[in-house]
Amino acid sequence: MSKGTTVLGSKNDPALGSENPTLSIQNLYAGYGRRAVLRDFSLTLNPGEFVGLLGANGAGKTTLLRAIMGLLDPASGSIRVLGSTARTARARIGYVPQKHQFQWDFPITVKDAVMTGRTREIGWFRRPKTADWIKVFHALERTDLMPLKNRPIGELSGGQRQRVLLARALAVEPALLLLDEPFTGVDAPTQSALTELYRQLAGEGVTILMSTHDIVAAQESCSRLCGVRGSLSLDGKAEDFSPQQLYAWVHGHELEGEGESTGKGGNAGTSPSPKIGVPGADGDSTGGTRQGHPAGHRITPQEVAA
């Protein structure tokens, strides 16, 4: 774990280390051209973890997902998926993009769209085998899409489209599942159903990393939350954060203790109850003060809840 990471979980939390992690990122530097987006980024994810990835626009969430999938070569550092390089292990990585990134006007059915998730395994311009269709139908069943398998994808609702993208990722039987804003544009019942399915997958040993701007959904869905500001600068159990703390962190205020060194071997020691700056009652987000407190006072979680 990188120096400067704020950790709210116990140092004995299994999320902080494993002998056989699904994903291991060490001292990663990555970006575009001469612009470094990720700097000395380290993260370990273990089998069965459901982790929310938080950060403002431009913080590095998309860059991280691209690097994990082997679509972006890092300047330095390492990414290992199941002990192999990201490119070698891509067949075991399922990716759920944002809905607008998929071509929904393409004239194919739901089952054919899900089969496109197996293109890398099958090969371009090759016909799927029976074993491929078995995996596709299993993914359709997991996502409750079997009744819609022959429907053109252009006729689907937003929630149905999100389930198609998930089924497409599940068709590769992933060990690591990457989700990019999976709750955008879906209604509450669909979000609840998807969350339950993600939890089931995690319970079966699938490691899930969900990039999202939805702080409430991340805290309600995930067991662990990580935050990126170029490097990994927030990490802990979801239950150890309040929504106010996460909102403040995403919008630029620091948790007390941020910047302190972590312990040896990447296991951080326990930290005190975090103190944060939050928007004042008058809507000013710069001061983080309340009436009766001097300028620069950092509001505690207890004061936030008051």
Q: Which residues are covered by each model-predicted region?
A:
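Conserved ABC ATPase "signature" region
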Residues: T130-L148
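Conserved ABC ATPase signature
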Residues: P152-L156, Q160
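H-loop (His-switch) and adjacent beta-strand-loop-beta switch element
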Residues: L225-A238
